[in-house]
Structure formats: structure tokens, C-alpha cells
Amino acid sequence: MIMKVFNTLTRQKEEFKPLVAGKVSMYVCGPTVYNYIHIGNARSVIAFDTIRRYFEYRGYDVKYVSNFTDVDDKMINEARKEHTTVGELADRYIKAFMEDTEALNIEPATLHPRATHEIQEIIDFVQDLIDKGFAYEVDGDVYYRAKKFPNYGQLSDQNIAELEEGASEHINEEEQSKKEDPIDFALWKAQKDDDEIAWDSPWGKGRPGWHIECSVMSTKYLGDTIDIHGGGQDLEFPHHENEIAQSEAKTGKKFVNYWMHNGFVTVGKKQEKMSKSLHNFVTVHDILKQIDPQVLRFYMSSVQYRRPINYSEDGLKQAETVLKRYQNTLRNLDARLMDEQETLEDSILRDNLTQAKAEFIEAMDDDFNVQNALSIMYDLTSNLNTHLQKNQVDKPALKKAKKLLLAWLEIFGVSFNEKQTENDDEIEVMVAKRDEARKNKNWAESDRLRDELQAKGIVIEDTPQGTRWHRA
């Protein structure tokens, strides 16, 4: 089957052809670590983790790099406000980010480089751009000559005149006096105050601009040309536009083959973008105190990555209901695999499995159409639940179905591994006593034991195949 990916650069779906057969190189812009990430930030992390997992499901070896921006204006301002250093602030929120993403079952990136650990490489990169005539220095600041790059504006589908008009409205007097053109952007920023974090450079003490950091880290760890560069739609311009200009000016090679951008998280009836500037955000750190991380993860994975997702309690409840359905199906499936009933081949179920697998791959190969894929998963559980009601089941087919469902759920970061606890043996004894009471029609004792089990958080299910239990 042909996998197709929507490329922001060309505004169309394209067949995915990796640079190296069987391998995928991915760079996804990570957070600026001056605070906890909010759910809008998490959308990108979850979306590209799901994409990465699907590539791995399809047999690709994925090298996934996602950076930490640990120095910029926001970092400096927040550190001053909290009377700490930029480095301490970064360490604190990188730790928080890793804890939040671990809770959401995000696979750690192959590499998580930090901008401040790449300063010499950044300086060398900037100097190369100056030597090639793509950059110039003014009073310790270094700017990129945007007009010199012939395709500037192509990614965001803007022409130079539009860009200049927009830039002129936002440029301050100091920048206007330094820049050759309003659309030029900073590669290196001179130190303004003695207490401001800075490094020695050929242009004096200063620090890197935001855009140059990702150009340096992506080319250093993945090469001059990479398969996929991802991030939120708000990074399309200026961040990713500037990355292209910097990287291709330096290397003379195509920077990225497939640009991918995820949609926003919106909130409320007006469906405003969730953002810190609008004060309408919820941090992952806070929301995970209230809901199961797996529910949030699944909810955020349930909409195709390019589409916006409107965050709501109803959406979370619906995601929780669907997850419980999958969990119950797998529990019932396990119970039937362990019962003593003889197996009976079911050609219809086997055909359903073959068809479902093909349709799931077809959906995900179409620019990661998770909505269609999840619909196929849901229909398969319906077929399985019907089959599980029969006196005799096709156990080889059920084993295959279990393996398939678990693999699909893993793509969405969902795992139902229920660890055995110390009192499981005690629960088994109580369930056996209740079964005995039911056989003897001692309904009072049966009800007493059921109530006692429920008080321990145990759910009892009486089926034709016997009693099943699980934790609520």
C-alpha cells in the first residue's frame, strides 16, 4: 500500500518516500521550557508521537529528534520574575515536561537536544551565513537577509510584498534602524543587560535567535535533508519559514521533504485557540490531577492531526466510554481464551479480521486518518463482542484479534496492562465462595460477598461461562 502525507509546502497529499528505505528521520519542534505545557502544546506532542508509532507499526526505523528551547526572551523574563537563573528554570520545566509526557505515554525522542548545549555549532552556522552573504552584523546583532533567499514565503504561501507590509506594522524603531529590510530576522542577539544570559561570539556577547536553534539541531542530528519536520500550525510562519531560509542557504540542499503541521486545540463555544496569551489554557500538569492520563491521550489522538480539536468535558467523557469498551472487550476475550469450551472455526470472524486490518492500514496510510481507523477498530470490537456470546468460539481467531487490537491501541498510546496485586489471591477466594453460594442458592451470602467485593473496588460479571471480575 502507498502511504500518503499532506505536505504543507505543496498544499497536497504526496506519496511518502523516505530518504533511506525502511528509515524515517523526524524533527519536531519542542517546547520553550519556561512553564508547564498546556493542552494546546500537548496536541503537537501527542499527534507526532502517534505518527511516529504508526511508522514503527509499519516496520520503519524512526529517528525522532525534538528539541528544548532553553534560552529566549520568555525564559529570561520568567527567570527574572522568579528570581532564579535561566538554567535552573529550564531544568525545572524540562523535568516537568518529561513527567507530563511520560504520564501521557509519549515515547521519549531518540534525542532531546537543548539549544544552550549547541552554542558553538550555532555560532559556526551563523558565521557561515555571514560568509555566504545571507547575513549581516549590526552592533552585535546578526540578521538574516530574507530577500536574498529566492523562495522566502513559499511555505506559508506569502509573497515578499505581503510579508514586508506585515513586518512594517510590528517593527520597533531600534530594529528599523538596524535592519536592511523589515522582514529580516535575528540570528544572534547582543546582550542588553549585564545580568542577561550570554555567550562570547565573534560579534560580542549575546545569545542565539529562536529560529537558528532548530536549523542547527536538526541538521546536526539528522543531516542536511530530513524526511519530516513537524510542529503546530502557528509555527508555519515565521519559525519554519525562517528555518528553511537559514538551512538551505547554508547547505545548498533541500532542507525538508515533508512539512507537517498539526491543528490547534480550541475551547468554548467560540472555539478560540487555546493559548497563554488569551489566558484560556489548562496545563497538562493540572488536568492530570483530575482525569486518567490515558483518557486525555486517547481524546487528543481521536481527531486527524491537521484538524482542530475542541477541548470539552463531553469529549473526555466520550473518550473514557470508548476506552472502557475496548478494555471490556479485551477482558471478555481473555476470559473466553481461558475457558474450557472447545474451539470452533468461524470463517466470518476470520474474514472480518483480515478485512479490518487492511482497512485500518488503508485509513492510516491516508495522511494518518485516525477517525476512519478508530471507526474500524470500533466495528471490529462489535463483531468480537457478538462472537464472544456464542457457546463455542474460534480461539485461534480470538488470539489474532487480541494481538491486532493491542497493536492498534499501542499506536494511540493506550495500554491496558493490569498489574497483579498482592490481594488478587484473596479476591479469587471470595469470588469462588460467592460462586459456591450461588450454586447452593444461598442468595443472602452471595449478595453479601458481592457487596464486600464492590467495597474493595471489584466489579463482578456473571456470564454463562462463569463469574468474571476486574477492578473498577
From Swiss-Prot:
Zn(2+) binds at C29, C214, H239, E243. Binds 1 zinc ion per subunit. The keyword Nucleotide-binding applies. Its cofactor is Zn(2+). It is found in: Cytoplasm. Its EC number is 6.1.1.16. Gene3D superfamilies: Cysteine-tRNA ligase, C-terminal anti-codon recognition domain (1.20.120.1910), HUPs (3.40.50.620). GO terms for biological process: cysteinyl-tRNA aminoacylation. Pfam families: CysS_C, DALR_2, tRNA-synt_1e. Belongs to the class-I aminoacyl-tRNA synthetase family. This is Cysteine--tRNA ligase. The gene is cysS.
